[in-house]
């Protein structure tokens, strides 16, 4: 269906260009950056950054690793996440899957962005506030292919998603 294909493409672009950068900013500031510093140390990370050939990418990596985002950048990212969550919740109230009546790449992309949201931002995503998002996340998490992917992980990430195992 042409309309479904359009919606899939629209949601993919929305997530990649609107939500992903905002989720990423929060993720790097509060989780990834501090964990990278604790695991590898500043000296080792600086050596890796200095091997990046483009100076502007070095600046971007330092900003991410050290959480050097301004208050304005964090506020705008928070606003974007709030808008995105509202849009996802509304769209998922229309059908089982995000962009069509069938599981699609939009669902894969969305799950990879949003699976940790109930844990990292529970005030924005929980069973009371976003029942459609929670239903959708749990449905994707129960898929055999998703389970197999999680088994391949080498970190404790899978242990953080107990909330998705609830019904």
Q: Model-flagged regions — what are they?
A:
Residues 42-70, 79-86:
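A structural motif
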Residues 90-102, 144-149:
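Surface-exposed helix-capping loop/turn segments at secondary-structure junctions
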Residues 1-53, 167:
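GST-like domain detector, emphasizing the conserved glutathione-binding G-site
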Residues 129-167:
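Long, positively charged, glycine-interspersed low-complexity recognition regions
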Residues 98-122:
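GST superfamily/GST-like fold recognition
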Residues 11, 73, 77-91, 113, ...:
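Alpha-helical packing segments of well-folded alpha/beta enzyme cores
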Residues 122-129:
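Structural helix-adjacent loops and short alpha-helical linkers that scaffold large soluble proteins
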Residues 1-7, 76-77, 95-106:
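All-alpha amphipathic helical-bundle segments outside canonical DNA-binding/catalytic cores
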């Amino acid at each position: 269906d042409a309309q479904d294909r359009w919606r899939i493409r629209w949601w993919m672009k929305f997530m990649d260009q609107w939500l992903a950068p905002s989720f990423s900013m929060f993720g790097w500031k509060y989780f990834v950056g501090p964990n990278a510093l604790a695991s590898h140390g500043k000296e080792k990370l600086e050596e890796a950054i200095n091997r990046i050939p483009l100076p502007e990418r070095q600046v971007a990596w330092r900003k991410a690793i050290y959480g050097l985002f301004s208050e304005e950048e964090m506020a705008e990212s928070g606003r974007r996440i709030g808008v995105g969550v509202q849009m996802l919740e509304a769209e998922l109230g229309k059908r089982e899957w995000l962009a069509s009546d069938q599981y699609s790449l939009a669902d894969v992309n969305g799950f990879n962005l949003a699976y940790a949201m109930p844990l990292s931002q529970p005030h924005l995503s929980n069973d009371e506030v976003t029942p459609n998002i929670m239903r959708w996340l749990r449905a994707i998490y129960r898929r055999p292919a998703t389970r197999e992917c999680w088994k391949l992980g080498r970190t404790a990430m899978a242990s953080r998603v107990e909330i998705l195992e609830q019904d």
